[in-house]
Amino acid sequence: KNIGNPFLTLYECVNPTEKHSNISMLSANLKLNNHFDFMIRSAFQMENDIREQHRPVSTVGFAKGYFKTQNIFNYELNSDVLLTYHNSFSNGLTLNAAAGGNMMVYKVNMLSNAANGLITPGVYKLANAISSIEWDQKILNKRVNSIYFTANLAYKNKLFLDITGRNDWSSTLPKKNNSFFYPSVSVST
């Protein structure tokens, strides 16, 4: 069994990482009248990771050294709209209801380049590769559009009926079967 030099592994087999991120949100709430409210919001999260992998010459598994770079860019955008209704009636009924929609967009782009063997030991640059650069790119795109509703009907705060429903359309499912609905109904006292 080949055991590596612990000093070399600890101090020279490094994985430097640089990360940049941004999270932003914007929202607005409007009271339309005594019974209706409207809310709109959007949130955006973006990250960019720049990663490296350094393996010096004579490292176990990397006799000629190794250098890898990865640039991972991803973002997610989430936007919602929601209309709510609330009313108490003179006959003891109270109704709270809401209907809305959501759009979620997610994207990842990962690009990797690797030098499997270094011309000059300790120089971690792709231009220092012994042979051609190995590269790989992965792209992931996902989008989910949703509509949803909820209603709560109460009678004298003793009998309750709750109904909810949500339908999602996902870009990662086959177009003919990309929709799924999940309802719920409950009665309680």
Predicted regions and their residues:
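A cross-taxa feature marking solvent-exposed loop/turn segments within ectodomains of secreted
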Residues: S90-G92
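Surface-exposed loop/turn segments flanking beta-strands in extracellular/periplasmic regions
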Residues: K1-L8, E52-F67, K107-W135
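Residue-level detector of the transmembrane beta-barrel scaffold of outer-membrane proteins
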Residues: D37-M39, T94-A98, F160-D162, S184, ...
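Outer-membrane beta-barrel domain signature, especially the mid-to-C-terminal portions
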Residues: A127, K176, Y182-S184
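Outer-membrane beta-barrel transmembrane strands
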Residues: P6-Q45, D49-Q53, T69-S88, V108-M110, ...
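Glycine-rich, aromatic-flanked loop segments that form ligand/cofactor-binding clefts
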Residues: G100-K107
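Solvent-exposed loop/turn segments connecting transmembrane beta-strands
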Residues: S171-N177
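Short, basic alpha-helical nucleic acid-contact segments in DNA-binding proteins
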Residues: Y106, S188-T189
